[in-house]
């Protein structure tokens, strides 16, 4: 941080392990990647082994790995989701991007379980799919444990500034390259 300003993070999409490594090699501060399930990129299909390898690689260079768990989760999938979240915690990913609040509930349960285990819980990032358009929504997300909020893509710079003024302690993320990830 310089002069009270936060450093801008260069966050790159990684459709697979190779793209993630290339992004880090070319200066990305962080990458986001989807697993085989629960990611909005249906074609991602990355194994947990690939995500673990990317996480190890990224951490060698001080970069972060965020995993997208940003689809609607159905009741019958909750046990699979919990298993995935456990794997992500244990491999040391830096954050989980969330759409469905069922992920939040399982995360809270795991946080209580892992509290004394030596594992660090990944940060929670609210995906743009949670339709983050207002200071009130950002407040609610913060109160529920989210450290970063990915704002709706349609917001103006003025609207983003107003949200930041209302919640300067919450990390805000905005897409700057268009509507596609």
Give residue ranges: language-model regions:
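N-terminal basic/disordered segments at the start of proteins
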Residues: 4-31
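Conserved anion-binding
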Residues: 62-63, 119-120, 136, 159-181
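N-terminal active-site wall of soluble small-molecule enzyme domains
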Residues: 57, 63-140
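Hydrophobic faces of well-ordered beta-strands that scaffold small-molecule active sites
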Residues: 9-13, 31-33, 65-69, 94-98, ...
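Conserved, mostly hydrophobic/aromatic
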Residues: 23, 100, 141, 163, ...
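Active-site-proximal loop/turn and secondary-structure-junction residues that shape catalytic pockets
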Residues: 14-18, 37, 69-73, 102-103, ...
């Amino acid at each position: 941080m310089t002069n009270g300003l936060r450093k801008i993070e260069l966050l790159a999409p990684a459709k697979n392990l190779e793209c993630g490594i290339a992004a880090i090699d070319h200066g990305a501060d962080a990458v986001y990647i989807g697993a085989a399930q629960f990611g909005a990129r249906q074609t991602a299909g990355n194994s947990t082994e690939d995500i673990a390898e990317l996480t190890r690689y990224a951490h060698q260079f001080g970069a972060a790995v965020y995993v997208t768990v940003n689809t609607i989760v159905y009741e019958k999938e909750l046990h699979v989701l919990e298993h995935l979240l456990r794997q992500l915690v244990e491999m040391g990913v830096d954050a989980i991007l969330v759409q469905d609040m069922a992920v939040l509930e399982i995360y809270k349960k795991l946080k209580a379980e892992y509290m004394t285990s030596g594992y660090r819980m990944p940060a929670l990032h609210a995906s743009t799919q949670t339709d983050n358009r207002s200071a009130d929504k950002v407040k609610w997300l913060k109160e529920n444990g989210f450290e970063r909020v990915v704002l709706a893509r349609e917001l103006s710079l003025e609207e983003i500034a107003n949200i930041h003024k209302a919640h300067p302690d919450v990390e805000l993320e905005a897409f700057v390259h268009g509507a596609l990830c």
